[in-house]
């Protein structure tokens, strides 16, 4: 969360509402507890995002990191126990490769053994190809907070929401297109 030069790179976290709907708030509490950073669950509408940012700024100004929730119409403290139970029954934690970041241990999910018959990759004998870096794309640095989107040499030129080059621009919710 801090840069190699000791400066803070990430001040706070805008947490994903769709994940918190299932998991609740507890899995995010370590951000405030261990790293001293505010973290707020927000929805996807502009007013939802603004509301989450306002709460986040208040926490930063007061110097009181916590986990907040402004997406109360969908996210509850405990999440969805039923959905979590299904996830835990069908999936196990696995290493995952993330566009722009590479392999992150224990950051993904894989079908448990008894569900492997439903694994299309295994069933069809497919393997994911290693993704090649995109020349000039700085998505990894943007996702880590090292660069802002407009500092990427591709941003707004060859990489736009209509013609995304890297993973940061692949949707209107991406870190560059949002």
Predicted regions and their residues:
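Solvent-exposed alpha-helices and their adjacent loops that cap or buttress functional pockets
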Residues: 2-12, 30-34, 129-131, 144-145, ...
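Short, composition-biased local secondary-structure segments
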Residues: 1-2, 118
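Internal helical hairpin/lid segments
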Residues: 51-141
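Cysteine-cluster motifs in flexible loop/terminal segments that predominantly coordinate metals
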Residues: 128-178
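Charged/polar, solvent-exposed surface patches and flexible loops
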Residues: 2, 29, 33, 58, ...
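Generic alpha-helical secondary structure signal
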Residues: 26-29, 47, 81, 85, ...
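A conserved active-site cap/scaffold subdomain adjacent to cofactor or substrate pockets
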Residues: 8-76
């Amino acid at each position: 969360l801090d840069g190699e030069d000791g400066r803070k790179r990430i001040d706070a976290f805008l947490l994903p509402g769709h994940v918190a709907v299932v998991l609740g708030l507890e899995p995010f509490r370590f951000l405030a507890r261990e790293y001293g950073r505010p973290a707020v669950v927000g929805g996807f509408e502009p007013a939802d995002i603004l509301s989450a940012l306002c709460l986040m700024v208040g926490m930063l100004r007061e110097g009181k990191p916590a986990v907040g929730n402004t997406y109360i119409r969908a996210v509850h403290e405990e999440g969805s126990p039923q959905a979590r139970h299904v996830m835990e029954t069908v999936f196990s934690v696995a290493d995952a490769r993330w566009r722009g970041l590479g392999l992150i241990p224990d950051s993904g999910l894989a079908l448990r053994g008894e569900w492997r018959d439903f694994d299309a990759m295994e069933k069809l004998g497919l393997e994911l190809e290693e993704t090649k870096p995109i020349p000039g794309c700085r998505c990894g640095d943007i996702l880590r907070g090292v660069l802002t989107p407009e500092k990427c040499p591709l941003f707004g030129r060859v990489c736009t929401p209509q013609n995304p080059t890297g993973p940061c621009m692949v949707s209107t919710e991406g870190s560059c297109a949002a």
